[in-house]
Design a protein with these regions (language model features):
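Conserved active-site alpha-helix within GNAT-family acetyltransferase domains
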Residues: 100, 124-143, 147
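Conserved GNAT acetyl-CoA-binding A-motif
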Residues: 110-122
Length: 149
C-alpha cells in the first residue's frame, strides 16, 4: 500500500447513494463475503439502503480494499446501537490494517450518533474473523438463532 487507507461513505443517512462509482467498485470485495448477492448488485444495495443501511468502503491506491454495511437503530435491549451487517477486507490484502480502519471509523460514527453499543454477527465458520474481533476488544454476548422460512 502506497497511500494511507481512507474511508468513503457510499450513501447518506437518507439512503441516497452519493458515491456511485465507489458502490460499483465495492461489489467484487463485497462478494468475497456475500457470494450469493444477486447480479443486480446496485439495485439490491439500493433496497438495503432504503431499509436504513449505510455503507462505507476502505480505499487505497484508488481501489476498494474493504467494505462495511451497517445501520443505527434502537431496540428495547441495547437502546441506540450500531449493527454491522457486513465487514470484509479484500482477501488478498488481509492483515494490513483494513479491518481495523473500518472498525475504527464505524465505532467513531457510532459514538457520534449516540450509540450505546456496537454489534455484529459472525458466522461460526469464520474463525480468522473471530480472532480479529477478539483482538479488537469485542466479546461474545449472545447466541444468534435462525430458522429458514
Amino acid at each position: 500500500m502506497n497511500e494511507p487507507i481512507r474511508i468513503v461513505e457510499i450513501n447518506d443517512a437518507n439512503g441516497n447513494v452519493i458515491e456511485t462509482g465507489w458502490l460499483a467498485a465495492a461489489e467484487p470485495v463485497h462478494r468475497q463475503l456475500r457470494a450469493h448477492l444477486p447480479a443486480d448488485y446496485a439495485q439490491k444495495m439500493q433496497r438495503v439502503f432504503g431499509d436504513g443501511a449505510r455503507m462505507c468502503v476502505a480505499v487505497c491506491d484508488r481501489r476498494v480494499i474493504g467494505v462495511a454495511v451497517y445501520r443505527i437503530h434502537e431496540n428495547t435491549f441495547d437502546g441506540v446501537q450500531m449493527y454491522v451487517d457486513d465487514l470484509v477486507s479484500d482477501e488478498t490484502r488481509r492483515s494490513q490494517g483494513i479491518g481495523r480502519a473500518l472498525l475504527d471509523h464505524l465505532q467513531r460514527s457510532a459514538r457520534a450518533a449516540g450509540c450505546a453499543k456496537f454489534n455484529l454477527d459472525s458466522g461460526t465458520q469464520r474463525q480468522q474473523a473471530h480472532r480479529f474481533y477478539f483482538r479488537e476488544g469485542m466479546v461474545v454476548t449472545s447466541f444468534h438463532f435462525a430458522k429458514p422460512l
